[in-house]
């Protein structure tokens, strides 16, 4: 997910995206805790995507 793609979305769409990413992060963390997650790099990717979305939401709220 690119930041330029996220900037084109509205705040409502970004909030929906954030909610989906938080759910995905929860599921990945549960899989990791139970030893079912083979691709542990996904945790890092989702965490960074959450940060991207939150950053853009904050910048749009300030503008």
UniProtKB/Swiss-Prot annotation:
InterPro entries named among the record's database cross-references: Ribosomal_protein_uL29 (IPR050063), Ribosomal_uL29 (IPR001854), Ribosomal_uL29_CS (IPR018254), Ribosomal_uL29_sf (IPR036049)
Renumbered to this chain, the signal peptide range is none
Listed GO CC annotations: cytosolic large ribosomal subunit
Family note: Belongs to the universal ribosomal protein uL29 family.
| Keywords carried by this UniProt record | Ribonucleoprotein, Ribosomal protein
Q: What is this protein called?
A: Large ribosomal subunit protein uL29
Nucleotide-binding among keywords: no
Q: Which Gene3D superfamilies match?
A: 1.10.287.310
User: Which SUPFAM superfamilies does the UniProt entry name for this protein?
Assistant: Ribosomal protein L29 (L29p)
Claim: Ribonucleoprotein is one of the keywords in the record: yes
User: What Pfam families does the database record attribute to this sequence?
Assistant: Ribosomal_L29
Q: What is the species listed in this Swiss-Prot or TrEMBL entry?
A: Shewanella amazonensis (strain ATCC BAA-1098 / SB2B)
Q: Which PANTHER family match?
A: 60S RIBOSOMAL PROTEIN L35/50S RIBOSOMAL PROTEIN L29 (PTHR10916), LARGE RIBOSOMAL SUBUNIT PROTEIN UL29C (PTHR10916:SF0)
The lineage's top-level taxon is Bacteria
Q: Biological process (GO) annotations?
A: translation
- Report the GO molecular function annotations: structural constituent of ribosome
């Amino acid at each position: 997910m690119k930041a330029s793609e996220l900037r084109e979305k509205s705040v409502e769409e970004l909030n929906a995206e954030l909610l989906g990413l938080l759910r995905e992060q929860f599921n990945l963390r549960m899989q990791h805790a139970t030893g079912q997650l083979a691709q542990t790099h996904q945790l890092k990717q989702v965490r960074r995507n959450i940060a991207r979305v939150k950053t853009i939401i904050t910048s749009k709220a300030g503008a």
